[in-house]
């Protein structure tokens, strides 16, 4: 599963960046779990810069009623979750 501070893949010339938000009370490896609608830090491609939110996650694993994000799940800007917990998984 993806946690606050784990990286996305980036897209086009927009580089990878860390997720900015997570659950206030659900932790994975002592780090807040990242969920659908949680924020991502801004990233840039020259002058254009944008932030984003988590678009999708597990179909049946939730934290605080929100789907948990996993490696490969889409970020709303076109990136995907990349880094993740080494030992906690949701749906394989």
Role assignments for model-derived ranges:
Residues 1-92:
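Intrinsically disordered, low-complexity proline/glycine-rich segments
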